[in-house]
Amino acid sequence: MAEEEVAKLEKHLMLLRQEYVKLQKKLAETEKRCTLLAAQANKENSNESFISRLLAIVAGLYEQEQYSDLKIKVGDRHISAHKFVLAARSDSWSLANLSSTEEIDLSDANPEVTMTMLRWIYTDELEFREDDVFLTELMKLANRFQLQLLRERCEKGVMSLVNVRNCIRFYQTAEELNASTLMNYCAEIIASHWDDLRKEDFSSLSAQLLYKMIKSKTEYPLHKAIKVEREDVVFLYLIEMDSQLPGKLNETDHNGDLALDLALSRRLESIATTLVSHKADVDMVDKNGWSLLHKGIQRGDLFASTFLIKNGALVNAATAGAQETPLHLVALYSPKKYSADVMSEMAQIAEALLQAGANPNMQDSKGRTPLHLSIMARNDCVFSQLLQCKQLDLELKDHEGSTALWLAVQYITVSSDQSVNPFEDLPVVNGTSFDENSFAARLIQRGSNTDAPDVMTGNCLLQRAAGAGNEAAALFLATSGAHANHRNKWGETPLHTACRHGLANLTAELLQQGANPNLQTEEALPVPKESPVLMSSADSIYLQTPLHMAIAYNHPDVVSVILEQKANALHATNNLQIIPDFSLKDSRDQTVLGLALWTGMHTIAAQLLGSGASINDTMSDGQTLLHMAIQRQDSKSALFLLEHQADINVRTQDGETALQLAIKHQLPLVVDAICTRGADMSVPDEKGNPPLWLALASNLEDIASTLVRHGCDATCWGPGPSGCLQTLLHRAVDENNESTACFLIRSGCDVNSPRQPGTNGEGEEEARDGQTPLHLAASWGLEETVQCLLEFGANVNAQDAEGRTPVHVAISNQHSVIIQLLISHPNIELSVRDRQGLTPFACAMTYKNNKAAEAILKRESGAAEQVDNKGRNFLHVAVQNSDIESVLFLISVQANVNSRVQDASKLTPLHLAVQAGSEIIVRNLLLAGAKVNELTKHRQTALHLAAQQDLPTICSVLLENGVDFAAVDENGNNALHLAVMHGRLNNIRALLTECTVDAEAFNLRGQSPLHILGQYGKENAAAIFDLFLECMPEYPLDKPDAEGNTVLLLAYMKGNANLCRAIVRSGVRLGVNNNQGVNIFNYQVATKQLLFRLLDMLSKEPPWCDGSNCYECTAKFGVTTRKHHCRHCGRLLCHKCSTKEIPIIKFDLNKPVRVCNICFDVLTLGGVS
């Protein structure tokens, strides 16, 4: 990309240069034309002007003999010239100067350049060439002969050719010729590309000019003079700045570079020496706190480093941040990154530093000495130089607590883990031992401490190497005098560390070196902060032996080493070896045998047992290894212990047996093994649950089957609710655990026994309810359990304390599937009654379980006709309860719809339906064939019964179905009589409008329905009366009953004012007497108020009464006693009783007419008593 950009820029510059040349040509032509125009300003024809003709003549004289008075030698040629032309161009060729001259010698100049100048002199034409040398020569020649215009044009031509590489040369030329335009242009390019200029670009400049240029272009001329390697310019600077020395020598430029450092980095010894001689500070530091010596070493500069050391630079100066001395920087050079020559130079620098008094024990910001760094960088040359230094302290530790030896022993590592291999390059693989030339061996030979315990943790180098998994280093240390029983902060020995990290070879070596295998840790090891490679539950345990460690961290090869060591130690003559003790326990009371089991090292566990480890040791909580294996759900370990004769009868502190634990933790193989070894399978737990129940309650049928197979009792009587005795089957059913119940049934448990009272009679209702498991299952709706019980011979007809069979219970709890299962049983007896006398069918009807009832009828067809203690069959009860579903069901199963209740009433279902007021049942009974005219014991039809109640719809239904509406009961009443008697207006309307019932019929008391109305009328009597007149306008209202009472008289005697008024409005006779001579006028009442109001409301003259006696005084009419009528009330009166006369305006009787005394009072006083 960078090259493409450069190419584009060069192309762009080329275009700009071409464009610039074009513009110059155009400018020259324009200037020429401008001159011509000015010369002939006032002439119309420019071609004929003197000036133009003169210029044309001069141009034509170029290289012509005509008028020539001068020769010019150009190279080997002599060119004809003209003095006046030359004099016109330059003062140096004035006529006075050329008066005696015959020839001008220009042979010293470039002929081509000279000819170009002469052509321009005559023709004012100049052809530019992109040749900077040619233009420069032409410009010098023009300057020589004071051809100012030509020089300016050459300047402009040269400016188009100026670039970064030649700008210095053109600048020098411009200064020589005093070409200010070109010089300024070059100065601008130099200023913009100052930092891009190379020392070669300044080589041709004189010291004075270069110094002048540098001063004008940069703030730091000394630094620039050194960069261009011009000692003469440096000298000029020192002379000029003598009064400000040495301060000026120690200034840093914009890049932070010191003048001395620039000189040294360029190996300018003469300049560097000059600077130092003028008091330049050799220990000056840059902005980063690095001295010149640091920087020289950093860039691998032997010349600069040795120069500074010789000139007294501080050899122990440390950098500002990392606190690294020059010796540190030298030590950091690695042969993996640098060539042998560079490494050799570094060794020379190190030697020079040490000879100059460098301190080899100084530590950087990380606490590392040059020795540390030389080991990390594997800088053998510097390492050797440091070892030869007598002041070297081998035991200094860095901030990580590492000595030089610790870093050296990691040289052999093959791990790629950065915590193990801190070196940046690939680890070196050179076997498993350190030769005598290794850093580590040389350090130990020099006297380095092989233990060097860490201050914080107390880990010695051997433990650190083992902890890092560097077994080769650890073996090297172990065989080089490291202490085998050193204990760190937590009481851990190197043997512990080796076992924890699985270093079998190191373990064997340490045991050979006398390491004690019975030492126990004092504290739990801390959990590593970083993501640990090795994590175990053992991280929080202490009091561990090395063997605990090996087992806990699952290193069987290490365990084998220790076991072999024990076997060998028993026969060894080496007193250094100590025999391991397998009975030691860690902080969790775990022996090595227990840990071997939990880590799955059963082969090792067997070897431990063979070596005398106890299999039945109990922990502080009373648990054996068998208990713990079961609780861990470690079947393999549990079986291992059982195979090696672990005690199965030992209980935990909570009283749990191994069998109970195995069931609780769902270990079928362990349960089988324990049962095989004769465990007691009837021992209950602390809650009284036997092992079989524990298994079934957890849905562990495989374990339960194992227990049963080994002879476990499936019935198992035990304590139940309220202290009664129950079997496991009772309990399973009571808890709705069908899978458990079915398992117990299939396992041969007792399926028929009910719960029993406790040994001392304990137990409440449950102990005496007599319910078998089948009763309980039917009650809870456990279909699978019921089916299983029936399959395995449960008594389907067993009765509980209430006499109920299972089918009774199933029906009462509405469990349809169970009902079908029970009814389908071949041995079912459906005639069994409970204490309430209910058969299963009766129970089904009681609970409206039609499906059950239908199923029972299929088995026993006569079940529906059974009657209760009141003589009612199921249809009767259903009708009385208005249970339409049951009625429809019974109708559907062909129940007798005309059967009568077996009691004194002898009512049919239709009678009961009417009494219940259920229209839909009435309709369905009629549809099913109920006889509509069946009579009760009082000879009443269903219509009679409906008429007495407010059941107009049922009346209509009965009428539609052909009921005998004329039928009368034992009192001679038809349905209309009874409807009127009970004031059933709607029923009366139905009877009067929907049939032709005789509304004038008399009952045995000689009363028609209207007489009944007058005698029994209620609040709606007037409405009933109006209905009669509406339906029968010609009804004989004055017709008396058997005792001579009219409707009005009966109503008046009953005080039914509304009915009386309705009757009076209909125009009846008012004064009719009954057989006892009583009428409304003489009937004894508390007040005549009603009578007066009835008379007052007469709007027309009523019909006259007839008779043989006066209605008022009862005098018999004869010849002397004539008949008269009261013209107001129509009564038959004698003369004495009708003496008063008065006009009756409301009857349109304007003349006085006869009225009775009562009517006179009414007419005069109004309807007021």
UniProtKB/Swiss-Prot annotation:
PROSITE patterns assigned: ANK_REP_REGION, ANK_REPEAT, BTB, ZF_FYVE
Zinc finger FYVE-type: from-to: 1104-1164
Membrane topology term: Peripheral membrane protein
Predominant location: cytoplasm
Binding site for Zn(2+) 1: C1110, C1113, C1134, C1137
Residue numbers spanned by region Interaction with RHOD and RAB5A: 650-759
InterPro entries per the UniProt record, alphabetical: ANFY1_BTB_POZ, ANFY1_FYVE, ANKFY1_BACK, Ankyrin_rpt, Ankyrin_rpt-contain_sf, BTB/POZ_dom, SKP1/BTB/POZ_sf, Znf_FYVE
Residue ranges of every copy of the BTB domain listed in the record: 68-130
Motif (NPF): 421-423
Modified residues (Phosphoserine): S270
Record bears the keyword Ribosomal protein: no
Top-level taxon of origin: Eukaryota
Gene3D superfamilies assigned: Ankyrin repeat-containing domain (1.25.40.20), Potassium Channel Kv1.1, Chain A (3.30.710.10), Zinc/RING finger domain, C3HC4 (zinc finger) (3.30.40.10)
Localisation: Cytoplasm; Endosome membrane; Cytoplasmic vesicle
Gene Ontology BP annotations: endocytosis; endosomal vesicle fusion; Golgi to lysosome transport; positive regulation of pinocytosis; retrograde transport, endosome to Golgi
GO CC field: cytosol; early endosome; endosome membrane; macropinosome; retromer complex
Tissue-specificity statement: Expressed in kidney proximal tubule epithelial cells; at protein level.
GO molecular function: phosphatidylinositol phosphate binding; small GTPase binding; zinc ion binding
UniProt cross-references to PANTHER family, sorted A to Z: ANKYRIN REPEAT AND PROTEIN KINASE DOMAIN-CONTAINING PROTEIN, RABANKYRIN-5-LIKE
Subunit details: Interacts with RAB5A (in GTP-bound form). Interacts with RHOD (independent of GTP-loaded status). Interacts with EHD1. Interacts with VPS26A; the interaction is independent of EHD1 and is indicative for an association with the cargo recognition subcomplex of the retromer complex.
Function (record text): Proposed effector of Rab5. Binds to phosphatidylinositol 3-phosphate (PI(3)P). Involved in homotypic early endosome fusion and to a lesser extent in heterotypic fusion of chlathrin-coated vesicles with early endosomes. Required for correct endosomal localization. Involved in the internalization and trafficking of activated tyrosine kinase receptors such as PDGFRB. Regulates the subcellular localization of the retromer complex in a EHD1-dependent manner.
Protein name: Rabankyrin-5
Species assigned in the record: Mus musculus (Mouse)
Gene: Ankfy1
